[in-house]
Amino acid sequence: VKDIDTKIDAISFFAAVIIVMSLFFFVSAHAVEIKTNTKPLFVYSLNSCITDLNKSIPTEKQIPSELIVAQAVIETGWGTSRFANEANNLFGIREGLKEFKTKCDSVKDYIRIINKVPAYAEFREMRADGITDSLLLARTLKRWAADPNYTDLIEDVIQHNIRGVYEL
């Protein structure tokens, strides 16, 4: 009887641990929801996602918030595009029709792409040299889109729609 009680206690303990861990991962994975109801709500909830992700990213691999926000604004029309709302894809990431579980997951993938894909080596080199200004770093993202004026669009959004408007 004592062995059975010990086994039941052990099973109960491990079941409790699994439940607690599941809740932790559920809460942490869903802690930041990017909202698209209004421009300010989109910007600030997106920035909250970025801030949350940056907690687990080394400083030298982080990407300026205003640059991430500017690209999301361009790619989704302030979070209102069908691609953003049906596929949770904020950056036009196309590997087929790439769908994400959450919008914040698309931000995580964007950060991975910038930090790993050879097309953005110049971005990483400038950042390694201590350049953190979004306008300068934006110039290195020519290959993100086919539009030859894409980096000009990023700069325009940063200068006229983000800086001085939102506190990031």
Language-model features and meaning:
Residues 2-70, 74, 78-168:
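Catalytic cores of secreted/periplasmic lytic hydrolases that degrade extracellular macromolecules
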